[in-house]
Design a protein with these regions (language model features):
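Amphipathic alpha-helical substructures
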Residues: 40, 243, 363-454
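Juxtacatalytic substrate-recognition/specificity segment
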Residues: 148, 192-305, 315, 319, ...
Length: 773
């Protein structure tokens, strides 16, 4: 793993002075390094990577000022290479202290970095801290313990991870687990704590930090704490003692998600919802697992995604089965199959060992196929095979860092023979590209009439051992296993004299196949079942397309077929409720809606659209108060764009009917008057004074170029997001000039403007739901 000379980061010590008005941060980063070479060579130079917009002013090596060069990395966009020759070489296992002083300016905010008044974000992916290795190499990210001292010139609460000391403008964080420095500044959050003591464990503090300012979030805070208590308890029981005595779930205005040991970032929407839905539970349970895997033990080496990401995803599935039962566990794995299916069908996926986060399909493959492979290990080689191996590693003292090869060795055990079954399985699924495509033939009764035989075939690659089921005319289910070689044949026999009416290979979709159903474009029969049937996910996608085309009766037929095959498919039940509503079938709407909500945990799609359907039903009853409550829940869910648009439309309609529409205060109305005048002044500096340019550079540039002759905003309603932000629904009318043709364009539509309150007044921070055309 180590090269001829290869520094490892042992520790970070960072001081950061944030200057939000200047969109800048002054940093002093101290890296404690060790030459970890395994080839006996001394290190003669140091190469670090840093954000290209960071201007390095000094480099000290072991306390001595050292000359350096800084140039853009030709391979990584937005990254620079800082390099220096060492005055004195560093022998193998020798240590080096490197201190960099620099100023980083973030001119345009993005998902990894932002420095603006009242809202800052610096994540490791932005390279705001110098590193030796990028996450895209076989080494992996340079995770290590750290201290981070942050000084803030301006308003906002400072957050990072680990033990916190200090309040107000200067705060220090000490993280003893393996991580990388990051920070966030946002609106003052409401902090709620709970002390738990999992069975046989030491006390652990759970904390939520919510920036959400709206009333009624107390229940959701408690639901999040309840879920975290169960998740942490599950992992203490499954993996051993917790590496940390605290877990924090913190929300943020940017809706950014980020996982670090003991601290989990979620969007503000998570705290606005009326339940902790399935996707958030998946995310939280995966995040907590990474406190053990990656936090306690560093993850390094080729194929690290298998351990760092696929393994926590698999463990999340075990939590679902433990927490909600077998049906919920099956739906968890069904979501993995559905998410991976398009990539499998495209046949463009790489072997798991070769994948790195830079790959466009990395997370689709690793979080889904990678987790399914771990599930296959448990199914084929015995329940808890994976957990037993992981717990052995975590409770031992011989494996740090944790590598794929270390996990492989522990799984296989003392028998390292290449033909050992688990050894061959891992080689096939981790080290090779495997694309199975399983089909089953018609069942045939034997001559004695006491059994039925089915021929099986693998049209794709990879040896498989797969379950096969038969359904008799009396409804009896018979199950057996069959081994099918790569591109080969197999068979199964069902011992029954009863008529077999249906057979299916791999009914639970254990294997990530390239196809699951009849391919109309293929002359080769290609289906997992006889009689042939369409996979429920494909039926759902077709029904959704028909719904968007307003072919409601055809969509209804598809969805009735879908839920008959898979009653626990909550999203299909939810779409069916929407279709029945469009058809005016109120009883059928209520029935499908209830079936969707009965599936626990509730998917986000159901969380959002169920509230829309409830709002629509309330409007038909002219129960405008109930409609307002439902649409507010739909808006808070932040499920998907169409759902949020429908929520805003419904809120405006129902609040208007109640004559209780939420209007902003006079200062917000005055802001829009100022913005209209600024835009029509056609002066960039005047516009920039009312907009956070780093957040909306394209908006500011667009106004400066098109120079609208008309810009009118009609304020419709407003809602307080947190102590710093307000969302304002507006109707917008503009007369702009086409930059190519010079023609005048009259544009109208609606938008949601997000305003931020700063020391100088309201400024535009974000534009959501922009439908101006």
């Amino acid at each position: 793993m180590a090269q001829a000379q290869d520094f490892e980061v042992l520790r970070y010590d960072v001081t950061a002075s944030l200057q939000p008005v200047a969109n800048a941060v002054d940093v002093k980063a101290t890296l404690s390094l060790v030459n970890q070479t395994t080839q006996g060579q001394s290190a003669t130079d140091l190469i670090l990577r840093l954000n290209k917009d960071a201007k390095v002013t000094a480099l000290l090596l072991n306390g001595a000022t050292t000359e350096f060069t800084q140039k853009e990395d030709p391979r990584l966009t937005g990254v620079s290479i800082v390099s220096a020759q060492l005055v004195k070489s560093v022998p193998p296992a020798g240590k080096l202290e490197a201190v960099l002083q620099y100023t980083l300016t973030v001119k345009e905010s993005n998902q990894y970095s932002a420095i603006t008044p009242g809202d800052c974000l610096l994540l490791p992916e932005s390279y705001w801290i110098p590193v030796v290795h990028t996450p895209f190499t076989s080494h992996g990210a340079d995770t290590a313990p750290y201290t981070l001292t942050v000084t803030l010139a301006g308003d906002g609460d400072i957050l990072s991870e680990g033990e916190r000391k200090g309040d107000g403008k200067t705060v220090m964080f000490t993280q003893t687990l393996n991580s990388q420095p990051w920070l966030m500044v946002g609106a003052p959050g409401k902090l709620v704590t709970r002390s738990i003591t999992p069975a046989g464990a030491t006390p652990i503090t759970l904390t939520t930090i919510s920036q959400v300012g709206s009333a009624g979030t107390e229940g959701q805070v408690q639901r999040i704490l309840d879920e975290m208590e169960k998740i942490v308890g599950f992992y203490v029981q499954t993996l051993g003692p917790s590496p940390t005595n605290q877990f924090v779930v913190a929300s943020n205005f940017r809706e950014v998600t980020y996982i670090s040991p003991g601290t989990i970032l979620v969007g503000n929407a998570v705290f606005r919802r009326d339940r902790v839905e399935a996707e958030t539970i998946e995310y939280l349970s995966r995040a907590v697992a990474r406190t053990w895997i990656g936090g306690k033990l560093r993850v390094r080496g080729r194929g690290l995604g298998i351990v760092q990401d696929a393994l926590p995803s698999f463990l999340s599935g075990l939590y679902f089965e433990s927490r909600f039962g077998a049906d919920a566990g099956q739906q968890f794995w069904a979501r993995r199959v559905r998410s991976y299916a398009p990539l499998a069908l495209a046949r463009t996926d790489a072997m798991l060992m070769a994948q790195v986060p830079l790959d466009s399909d990395y997370f689709t493959s690793i979080l889904n196929k990678g987790a399914l492979v771990f599930r296959l290990i448990d199914w084929q080689f015995g329940k808890n095979t994976v957990v037993t191996a992981v717990k052995t590693i975590l409770t031992g003292t011989t494996m740090d860092p944790l590598t794929v090869e270390g996990l492989r060795s522990t799984l296989i055990g003392p028998d390292k023979n290449a033909n050992q079954p688990l050894q061959r399985f891992l080689k096939q699924w981790w080290d090779e590209i495997v694309e199975p495509d399983l089909i089953i033939g018609l069942p045939k009764k034997n001559e004695t009439g006491t059994a039925w035989t089915c021929v099986l075939r693998n049209l794709g690659t990879g040896d498989v051992t797969v379950p096969v089921v038969a359904i008799t005319g009396k409804g009896e289910t018979l199950t057996t296993k069959a081994a099918i070689p790569s591109k080969g044949l197999g068979s199964v026999e069902f011992q029954t004299a009863e008529e077999v009416v249906r057979v299916e290979i791999d009914p639970d979709k254990l294997y990530p196949q390239t196809k699951f159903e009849l391919d109309p474009n293929s002359s080769q029969f290609d289906n997992d079942s006889r009689p042939p049937r369409q996979y429920s996910f494909s039926l759902f996608l077709e029904a959704n397309q028909l719904f968007e085309q307003k072919e409601f009766q055809k969509a209804e037929a598809k969805l009735l077929q879908t839920v008959a095959q898979e009653p626990g498919y909550a999203s299909a039940q939810m779409l069916l409720a929407r279709v029945e509503l469009a058809l005016g079938k109120s009883e059928a709407t209520q029935s499908a809606l209830q079936k969707a909500l009965d599936v626990k945990p509730t998917p986000l799609y159901v969380t959002g659209w169920s509230a829309i359907v409830e709002g629509e039903l309330a409007l038909t009853r002219k129960d405008f108060k109930a409609a307002v409550e439902a649409y507010r829940r739909a808006d808070g869910a932040n499920a998907e764009l169409a759902c949020t648009l429908a929520a805003h439309k419904g809120l405006i309609e129902s609040e208007t009917q109640l004559q209780q529409i939420s209007m902003p205060d006079e200062s917000v109305k005055a802001y829009f008057s100022q913005l209209e005048k600024a835009v029509q002044s056609k002066t960039a500096s005047v516009i920039e004074a009312l907009v956070i340019k780093a957040e909306l550079p394209k908006f500011v540039k667009g106004l400066a170029l098109t120079k609208p002759d008309v810009w009118k905003t009609e304020v419709i309603r407003a809602s307080q997001l947190d102590t710093q932000h307000v969302a304002v629904d507006v109707n917008l009318e503009a007369l702009t000039t086409d930059l190519i043709t010079g023609e005048k364009k009259d544009q109208k539509g609606s938008a949601v403007f997000i305003l931020r309150k700063t020391q100088s007044g309201w400024v535009l921070a974000r534009i959501d739901l922009f439908t101006v055309k």
